[in-house]
Amino acid sequence: MDGEGHDINIWGARMSPSPAAAPVSATRGAPWSGCEGCPSRAADRRCVCH
């Protein structure tokens, strides 16, 4: 599943253009706040840390 890595990059760039805003939004008391690798909700589904 090499496409998985590409999917995360595409989602991260589409949802959060700024890498700094990504972690901040995820830490806003969200269900995926424990996942620092997931910049957006869409990426959370592909992220291993649910």
From Swiss-Prot:
Residue pairs linked by disulfide bridges in the UniProt entry: none
Keywords: Cell membrane, Lipoprotein, Membrane, Methylation, Pheromone, Prenylation
Sites bearing Cysteine methyl ester, chain numbering: C47
Residues anchoring lipid (S-farnesyl cysteine): C47
Renumbered residue ranges of the record's region Disordered: 1-32
Compositionally biased tracts (Low complexity): 16-26
Bilayer disposition of the protein: Lipid-anchor
GO CC entries: plasma membrane
Residues of the propeptide: 48-50
Location in the cell: Cell membrane
UniProt keyword Lipoprotein, yes or no: yes
Function: Activates B-regulated development.
Protein name as catalogued: Mating-type pheromone BAP1(1)
Organism annotation: Schizophyllum commune (Split gill fungus)
Gene: BAP1(1)
